[in-house]
Amino acid sequence: MKVAEIIVVEGKDDTRRIQEVVAADTIETIGSAINDEILTQIEHAQETRGVIIFTDPDYSGEKIRKTIMEVVPDAKHAFLSRKVAVPKKNGGSLGVEHASDEAIIEALKKVVTPVQADEDYQEIPRQTLVEYGLIAGANAKKYRELLGDDLRIGYTNSKQLVKRLSMFRITEAELKESMTRILKELANEE
């Protein structure tokens, strides 16, 4: 599989892993404190070929994603679930470099692009998120993680959830479908 866009990753291990799986060029952020030179490089890459932000499914990865989005709001996003980014050995951190070939290819095939302001879009009411147990409640974190995987929008904490759903223009109907699938799967596991 050849990827036309330039993939933005966190480090050289991610680059190595991506290039083992697909033919792609990468830009490495070299950690979460991205310098202006790298941001300029990412901005230029977006103008010429487009970029896909493919960071680790952890706090640092989200911080990097947010920083890049301030400069390149129309960048595409590839997300890995936390469960497929777990290191083989105990003690390591979550990372793109630990994902299987299949997980990387799947994430790149399901790239999502945030949409700019749309006057017709109805933001999902916070109360709806509370009713689904996504904000507050014993299973809120687990539900948000499963929702992020199902909708391919990545994991968010409760404060980020409304913004992320809005950014990708997830409708209340799509949320309901996703939560119905998630709750059905969880019921089948019991």
UniProtKB/Swiss-Prot annotation:
Q: Which SMART domains match?
A: TOPRIM (SM00493)
Gene Ontology cellular-component terms for this entry are: cytoplasm
Query: EC number(s)?
Result: 3.1.26.8
GO MF annotations in UniProt: metal ion binding; ribonuclease M5 activity; rRNA binding
Location in the cell = Cytoplasm
Which cofactors does this protein require?
Answer: Mg(2+)
The chain's disulfide connectivity reads none
Task: Please give the chief subcellular localization of this protein.
Answer: cytoplasm
Is Protease among the key words of this record? no
Looking up Pfam families in the UniProt record yields:
DUF4093, Toprim
- Which residues does Mg(2+) 2 bind? 56, 58
Q: Which GO terms of type biological process are on file?
A: rRNA processing
Does the record bear rRNA-binding in its keywords?
A: yes
**Annotated function:** Required for correct processing of both the 5' and 3' ends of 5S rRNA precursor. Cleaves both sides of a double-stranded region yielding mature 5S rRNA in one step.
Into which family does the record put it? Belongs to the ribonuclease M5 family.
Give the protein name, as stated in the record. Ribonuclease M5
Q: Which organism is it from?
A: Enterococcus faecalis (strain ATCC 700802 / V583)
Lineage of source species: Bacteria, Bacillati, Bacillota, Bacilli, Lactobacillales
Give me the gene this protein comes from: rnmV
